[in-house]
Amino acid sequence: MSAFSPENITGAFIPSALFVAGTFFFKQELTPFAVALAAVLVGWKVFSNKPRKVLNPGDFQHFTLKEKNDISHNVTVYRFALPRPTDILGLPIGQHISLAATIGGKEVVRSYTPISSDNEAGYFDLLVKAYPQGNISKYLTTLEVGQTMKVRGPKGAMVYTPNMCRHIGMIAGGTGITPMYQIIKAIIRNRPRNGGNDTTQVDLIFANVNPDDILMKDELEQLAKEDDGFRIYYVLNNPPEGWTGGVGFVTPDMIKERLPAPSSDIKVLLCGPPPMVSAMKKATESLGYTKARPVSKLEDQVFCF
């Protein structure tokens, strides 16, 4: 929040100015004290409204569930409140958080990437698909508004910075879209037309089983509509009649046609079900990209979340 935000102007600067003016009018000799007191008030107000990063990588904290919005029969967006309305998670672009819960007498920990960003203060959103065998995802479905969840972070090897490469290719499957969405939003928000400097080109291959499985399709389509540097190619196992996207699994030919060719100034990001990621590692290697490591590092050409 800017020091000269409307909230600070109406809540600190104007009252302080009126206080000093009133003191000068009624008791001029106390004006220096009034000025000093007003300065303290303004400083406190501005500082207290400054966004505070609340994540702690070493300790779990409890955050209260504020809202639950069902996207489909098994996909929900969970909104968790931060302690103060001006608080932010403090999550670097490309990183994720850990959620923990005691299930069956044991503590279970899973990683998730928020679909919200630090531009949105006071809360964070998680898009979660409930799987039959998913411990934390099933636990979240039982969580009621007002109850808390244990959260720790940030974590992860990916920290996106503007123009870290010329062109990014992305391959996502299912809920693997969440870290991609976070990065795509950050890039487009930081375009020169928006006052930033990020000129990175982005191509996304997004694979799903059925049309209804395409998560955040409206949001992705809107981003692609407003930014000609971002393109999407959908792949479905069970496409509807008249489908013009990809069919079946993501193939090397699709990657070759849709994503940037191997080069020192590009990256390919992978996120999705383990069998898919494993297949994409082999496919990218066969196309001449640097072989993906078992555990990815930031400098890798092919990075797996």
Swiss-Prot record:
One of its GO terms (cellular component) is mitochondrial outer membrane. InterPro entries: CBR-like, Cbr1-like_FAD-bd_dom, FAD-bd_FR_type, Flavoprot_Pyr_Nucl_cyt_Rdtase, FNR_nucleotide-bd, OxRdtase_FAD/NAD-bd, Riboflavin_synthase-like_b-brl. The chain crosses the membrane at residues 29-49. It comes from the Eukaryota. GO terms for molecular function: cytochrome-b5 reductase activity, acting on NAD(P)H; NADH dehydrogenase activity; transferase activity. Residues 58-161 form the FAD-binding FR-type domain. Belongs to the flavoprotein pyridine nucleotide cytochrome reductase family. Pathway: Protein modification; peptidyl-diphthamide biosynthesis. Monomer. Component of the 2-(3-amino-3-carboxypropyl)histidine synthase complex composed of dph1, dph2, dph3 and a NADH-dependent reductase, predominantly cbr1. This is NADH-cytochrome b5 reductase 1.
